[in-house]
């Protein structure tokens, strides 16, 4: 059971009473009157997702979404052969074709939500053209989608699918696409399709249900969709199906072990027990998800950036920060964090989502969002077209930025920022709202007694520490507004209409302000940031430098070498004949300055770290995009020393970290650090110099 812990309550009077409470979790004794939450007997949700479209992004997140629209996400259907509508099993009238597996729903999952967030009519129409085919594909027995898949798991027996059974994994993704469409459109055909499909699933014998590798690992996504439908229809047979799905899914509740160590599976599937916990209310399942999260990181995640080393699979002995993770893994981790946050209310998951979103995911794509790479690492001195195996697990050009390549990540990247934007605000069980992932936006929602309000948030967070919120409302409304205090912040301050509030500023908490809010009210939140260091004893005692939610990398001058996307593509890549490599080039990124620096121990041991790690600021970028090496609005100046023996190794990667403390006779130099999300070549885990 999630306990509600009230730290202190203070009453403060303006014209009417305002109640201010610091809580570690929201109370779930009430049920939100306006937005779909968990029905009985499911465990009540701590926070409730608002329908897509209720949040209008602004500031840098809007710019990022526009870059997606104008870049790879918005135009991948012109490039990828898997998205070609000709003879596509997802688009055909008879559910047959020579291609059609996970790629279409992967792409559509983020493409559609991006369309709804930006209210882009052209993209919405394109989304609907696919979903109309999906809805019409449903057979009389309830199954929908391609009759057979041509992917790694198909109706043809292979290593992943030895029995040659129909693979349900692609349908799991498409169900999420349909749910977003229903949120946006209220098209009841989605509910009808899901009911009939789940009745079909109910009839599949356990002996042939969720048998192949991907669907077996990722059955939690199927489980999530069952609960989504149950919360709308209340049909009790769906809870029986949920038990069946959980029982036939890989066991993510093992103690000190995982069913497999594939990076995307771990990032995506560790949430499965917590999802099932909503039905059982048995804390064993909730704790299992926390255990899975901690287990992978205790061995392979002793690195900055929030992820772990599994450049396909986590491998014994490959724990250095030069090991990377797939772009797929990053966006699935963000989605898992958002779901865990709604289930548990634990602000840890918001902190972690930001850690990945700000520090790891931006570096996986080009600044113009027209290309991406398969693998990104916390320490990455080169991003080229060479084969780096076995330094990384797979053979091939996995480090190159290439819009024609990286089949799974090429399509699955789309969900990252749209899902983040949809979770910036959430509804609360007591008919309020929570500012969860701070970013510029307008949220319009029903609150209190049913009044509709808009809250306009303006901020440059995480590059600045101030967040401003303005109330826009036709009528006053009494409702609670929750403001998250991150774990790294120990002295948050809040003002309402220029009056400072008195409250207990507690890291990893929420400040709940219940008030009669009226048009023109404004709230100002200041989240003071300070330099903090993280030591990694399990990774050669290296160190990383943090400022608020941002982790910093050595600034390495990056040379971008344009290349033909066809020449540097992975062997499995396929593109449409009309795809123009001149319009969509690939890039190698080569360092033009030294990358092999360490930080002297004496710099780290000073009482006042701000003296040796001086935070500097530049003007906000005119294009509203802060994740670029040359234009990031914040940087740190400190001292470092070159380590001549730390070089590129025989696999073409930066060598593993030397054990700290390191002895070197090189001269002390002034070095510049930038947010690691803006560094596509990066050193973010530094050796410590004696």
Label every model-predicted segment.
Residues 45-57, 115-128, 181-195, 230-243, ...:
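Structural helix-adjacent loops and short alpha-helical linkers that scaffold large soluble proteins
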Residues 15-103, 124, 128-150, 188:
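Low-complexity, Ser/Thr/Pro/Gly-enriched N-terminal "stalk/linker" regions
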Residues 77-98, 145-166, 216-231, 258-276, ...:
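Carbohydrate-binding/catalytic loop surfaces
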Residues 93-97, 115-245, 255:
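Extended ligand-binding groove/face enriched in aromatic
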Residues 18, 23-30, 289, 350-359, ...:
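C-terminal beta-rich recognition modules with glycine/proline-rich loops and embedded aromatic residues
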Residues 489-515, 533-538:
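Solvent-exposed beta-strand/loop surfaces of large extracellular or lumenal domains
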Residues 26, 60-91, 126-143, 192-209, ...:
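Long, well-ordered core segments of solenoidal/helical folds
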Residues 100-116, 166-182, 215-231, 262-278, ...:
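Well-ordered alpha-helical segments within folded domains of soluble proteins
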């Amino acid at each position: 059971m999630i306990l509600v812990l009230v730290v202190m309550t203070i009453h403060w009077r303006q014209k009417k009473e305002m109640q201010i409470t610091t809580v570690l979790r929201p109370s779930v004794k009430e049920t939100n009157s306006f937005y779909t939450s968990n029905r009985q007997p499911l465990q009540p949700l701590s926070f409730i997702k608002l329908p897509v479209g209720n949040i209008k992004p602004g500031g840098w997140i809007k710019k990022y979404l526009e870059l997606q629209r104008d870049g790879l996400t918005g135009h991948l259907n012109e490039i990828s052969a898997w998205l070609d509508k000709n003879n596509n099993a997802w688009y055909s009238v008879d559910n047959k074709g020579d291609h059609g597996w996970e790629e279409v729903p992967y792409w559509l999952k983020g493409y559609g939500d991006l369309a709804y967030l930006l209210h882009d009519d052209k993209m919405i129409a394109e989304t609907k053209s696919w979903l109309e085919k999906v809805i019409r594909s449903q057979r009389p027995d309830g199954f929908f989608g391609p009759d057979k898949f041509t992917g790694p798991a198909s109706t043809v027996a292979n290593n992943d699918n030895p029995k040659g059974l129909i693979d349900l994994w692609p349908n799991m993704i498409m169900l999420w696409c349909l749910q977003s469409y229903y949120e946006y459109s209220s098209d009841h055909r989605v509910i009808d399709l899901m009911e009939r499909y789940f009745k079909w699933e109910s009839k599949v014998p356990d002996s042939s249900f969720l048998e192949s590798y991907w669907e077996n690992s990722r059955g939690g996504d199927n489980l999530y969709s069952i609960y989504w439908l149950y919360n709308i229809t209340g049909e009790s047979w769906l809870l029986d199906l949920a038990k069946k799905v959980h029982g036939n899914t890989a066991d993510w509740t093992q103690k000190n072990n995982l069913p497999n160590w594939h990076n995307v599976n771990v990032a995506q599937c560790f949430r499965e027990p917590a999802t099932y916990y909503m039905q059982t209310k048995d804390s064993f399942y909730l704790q299992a998800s926390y255990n899975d999260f901690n287990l992978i990181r205790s061995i392979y995640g002793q690195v900055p950036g929030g992820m772990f080393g599994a450049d396909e699979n986590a491998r014994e002995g490959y724990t250095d920060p030069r090991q990377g993770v797939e772009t797929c893994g990053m966006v699935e981790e963000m989605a898992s964090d958002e779901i865990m946050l709604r289930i548990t209310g634990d602000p840890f998951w918001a902190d972690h989502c930001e850690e990945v979103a700000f520090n790891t995911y931006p570096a996986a794509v080009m600044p113009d969002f027209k290309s991406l790479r398969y693998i990104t690492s916390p320490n990455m001195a080169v991003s080229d077209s060479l084969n780096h195996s076995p330094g990384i697990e797979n053979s091939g050009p996995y480090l190159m930025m290439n819009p024609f390549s990286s089949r799974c990540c090429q399509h699955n990247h789309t969900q990252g920022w749209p899902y983040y934007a949809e979770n910036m605000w959430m509804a609360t069980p007591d008919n309020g709202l929570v500012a969860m992932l701070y970013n510029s936006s307008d949220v319009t929602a029903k609150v209190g007694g049913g009044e509709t309000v808009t809250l306009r948030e303006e901020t440059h967070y995480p590059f600045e520490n101030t967040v401003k919120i303005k109330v826009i409302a036709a009528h006053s409304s009494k409702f609670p507004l929750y403001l998250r205090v991150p774990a790294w912040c120990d002295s948050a301050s809040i003002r309402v209409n220029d009056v400072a509030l008195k409250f207990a500023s507690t890291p990893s908490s929420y400040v709940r302000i219940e008030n009669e809010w009226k048009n023109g009210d404004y709230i100002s939140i200041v989240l003071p940031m300070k330099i903090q260091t993280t030591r990694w004893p399990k990774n050669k005692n290296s160190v990383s430098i943090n400022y608020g939610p941002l982790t910093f990398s050595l600034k390495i001058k990056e040379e971008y070498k344009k290349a033909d996307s066809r020449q540097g593509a992975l062997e499995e890549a396929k593109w449409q004949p009309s795809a123009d490599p001149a319009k969509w080039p690939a890039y190698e990124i080569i360092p033009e300055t030294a990358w092999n620096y360490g930080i002297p121990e004496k710099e780290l041991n000073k009482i006042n770290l701000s003296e040796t790690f001086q935070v500097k600021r530049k003007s906000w970028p005119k294009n509203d995009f802060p994740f670029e090496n040359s234009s990031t609005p914040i940087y740190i100046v400190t001292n470092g020393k070159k380590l001549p023996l730390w070089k590129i190794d025989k696999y073409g990667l930066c060598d593993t970290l030397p054990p700290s403390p390191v002895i070197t006779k090189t001269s002390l130099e002034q070095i510049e650090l930038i947010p690691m999300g803006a560094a596509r070549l990066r050193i973010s885990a530094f050796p410590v110099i004696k």
